[in-house]
Amino acid sequence: MNIFYLDKDPVKAAKVQYNKHVVKMILESAQMLCTAHRFYGNNNVPYKTAHLNHPSTIWTRENANNYKWLFRHMMHLGDEYTKRYGKTHLSITKCWDTLCHLPPNIPQEPLSLIHI
């Protein structure tokens, strides 16, 4: 599980990803976001808990702004995937309508430094 935090702006960070990272990071982002939902009690998400104690997964669920950053980044990685490969990534199709909502009771705090 990784987050390639290449820019503070999640859109810019998505645009500068290597092709292989665009493909893989959409799935990993979706898994971390689903894990955040499960951590806060919402089990109605497409992916099972994955790497619960990995620093990137912990960062994702730390607060609402971290979660929103990764969700926005994942969606723009999806846009990059579509531009580069001419199709929609399956994880975007499976997850966007669920993951666009914050997990219940996630703390409302400022965006925190990412754990590298």
Residue ranges: model-predicted function:
Residues 104-112:
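Conserved NAD+-utilizing ADP-ribose enzyme module
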Residues 1-82:
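An N-terminal structural lobe/cap that precedes and organizes the functional/catalytic core
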Residues 68-103:
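Charge-dense polyanion-binding interfaces
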Residues 114-116:
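Conserved small/polar residues in nucleotide/adenosyl-binding loops
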